[in-house]
């Protein structure tokens, strides 16, 4: 095949090579964690009970590791931007590669305004004194001045950070992910020292019979893939690995992200379950944040959890922004979309037009508000599943 006919030719515009193994683990892990462990942990306990939720997340992580092994094999073999787009082309040709690129581009891009909206909601919860009056209502949800300012400010920060070079973005992602684990380690330690394992009873949701136990685990398995999504951001940035990095380390980063995330979720569920009776914990709006204050009177622990959640939201935002721009860039460079998306900044060696395009769409999110969250989740989930099924 002639080079001009190949969507991934050897002579092509390339991105800066600056990411280390630590950066890739930070990219995958930071994208996985997000804020679900704070916002919907009560739902995990409701569905499975403490042990049911822990087993569900471990088994789910184990099953996704099988998919991760495929990524671990393909990413070093085809270390170019776009991940699944390149994988699909190598296996099926430009037709299915084009479909894959559309599904994944749509999925990743839709998640960026989701994060921009969520940041305003979280900041209002973290600093209730800053909460402002509603400016207008969209879909039954109010949109405040604070939520708009917070969403726009974070979006601009992510856009500028990524435009000015992947090295800065990767360093920030790694540092923020480490801070999340420091915060989480603190409140897990408190729970282990002050909590009571008797609070975990009953261990499973339902009657406790064999069928109920199995049902508890299956109920968690049904939602696990959503909370592990993010490890697939690593292949999107494979082209930007530092020259000294062994390509096989990219595969190690994928597997490491999944394993560490499984341990993270298990510890969070355990800590939440032993600090007080979990049947009472699930009645709180943000159980992971409020349970520690209710159980031990530690207001600072609540703030610590919310601070970790704030960093989690930012790392998932940054990770999905990187993935969205790399898929769009790779598709444009391949000629499957306008070549405009494949342009690279001469100064920073970043996909400048892809960044500006995704950034522009992201900036719309804060003005729509929380009414957009559920539709975004539904559409993004369908797009991700469609893209993954092809590859």
Q: What are the residue ranges of the model-derived segments?
A:
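Membrane-interface "cap" regions at the ends of multi-pass membrane proteins
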Residues: 1-42, 46-51, 64-69, 80-81, ...
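Helix-loop-helix junctions that connect adjacent transmembrane segments
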Residues: 10-15, 54, 130-146, 175-304
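Membrane-water interface regions at transmembrane-helix termini and the short interhelical loops
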Residues: 15, 75, 99, 153-179, ...
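Extracellular loop-to-transmembrane helix junctions
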Residues: 16, 40-141, 257-267
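Juxtamembrane helix-boundary/capping and inter-helix hinge elements in multi-pass membrane proteins
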Residues: 49-50, 78-81, 90-96, 239-250, ...
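Transmembrane alpha-helical segments of multi-pass small-molecule transport proteins
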Residues: 57-59, 127-166, 181-187, 354-361
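TM-loop-TM module centered on a large, flexible mid-protein loop between adjacent transmembrane helices
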Residues: 86-88, 93, 125-130, 253-318, ...
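Hydrophobic alpha-helical segments of multi-pass membrane transport proteins
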Residues: 183-187, 328, 378-391
